Amino acid sequence: MVGRRSFLKTATTGLVAWGLGAKQVVAQLIGSKYKFVMDSGPAPETTINGKRYLYFGGTGYFAFQTHPEVIKAAQKALADFGTCSATSRNVFGTFPIYLEVEKKAGEFFGAEDAIYLPSGYLINIAGFQSLAQLGKFQAMFVDEGAHWSITDFMYALQKPVYTFAHGDPEDLDRKIKANLKPGEKPLVASDGIFPTFGKVAPIPDYFKIAERYDGCVWLDDCHAIGVLGENGRGTYEYYGLKSPRLYFGGTLSKAIGAHGGIIPGNTEVVLPIRTGHVVNGANSSVSAAAGAAIKGMELMMAHPELRQQLWRNARQLKAGLKKIGFDQDDSPVPVAAWTLKSGEDMDRVHQKLMERGIAIQRTRYVGAGPNGALRAVVFATHTPGQIDRLLGELKALV
């Protein structure tokens, strides 16, 4: 009889062998629908469409996605538990490793409890459902620049929803005054970091307004986890905010280098999610992702110097862009975006950089505007020389 570990090892080896043999075919199939296909994991140097590039895209802020210890932890989880539980968490689908993710997240965020979800995209609907069930709000007020995972789900609760001008606390106050009915409490929903331009939301102002009306704030903090705050706990820590009226969720796929969503908080808020539709109606997360998440959080806590390096790289990138003539803020967010006179100009610069072996993003993502933008991201693992090369090539083209 073939042992469980032996079977999993053989199956994994076979899949890897098949994947390598079929890489060209798969790339061709995907290439018919997507312009770019990554042939290696995100790192300062990455292979795209079969060519090696200096890579300034995505959200792998610490390149944990290719860190040997993270990969080893993912492999062990896969060998121990198989690919997934093939059922929901509240049936038989809770592996011990999922509980360990939640325990580690509580430690990382300094929270009483946490719930691990299969995807970061689910954090907002899960959070909204919990807060609504607990009676924390009766009407939602959403920053119009919020991520799609907020705007896609904000009407699902069948509660009144109002949008306010992007990053504008005064408009938020006006909308609440005009629309909140007597006895109602507002929920203000926003990103912590808006992903395209890397701007940090004015959360202290949002919070003051929400508190004035006995309301609360919910943040999609996917881009801030690991990046902002002394301990990498995100936007609230960055601003020094603490209150039982502040709630958030995030992803483990960016700074942490794994996959899945995480909502830290007190047990009152976590319990309705643990027993709710998002958890009951979905398969549990991939075991390898859980193993990677635990190791990613451990590395984040053990190596705060990585965050300091990330901030240094962010300062170098933004200072260089300012010298070229592009307006940039002074935040430690390692994301910078800028526009040129026309979409055609941005297409040209993007193409020329690709020809010179440098990959940045030509983005039309949330908040990019009708012509889109050019966007560059630095990792903690980029060298000063690599960042200088990007800046030098960009300056020559604009």
Enumerate the predicted regions with their spans.
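Conserved N-terminal alpha-helix of the aminotransferase class I/II PLP-enzyme fold
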Residues: 79-119, 314
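Conserved PLP-anchoring active-site segment centered on the Schiff-base-forming lysine
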Residues: 130-148
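Active-site phosphate-binding strand-loop segment of PLP-dependent enzymes
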Residues: 162, 166-219
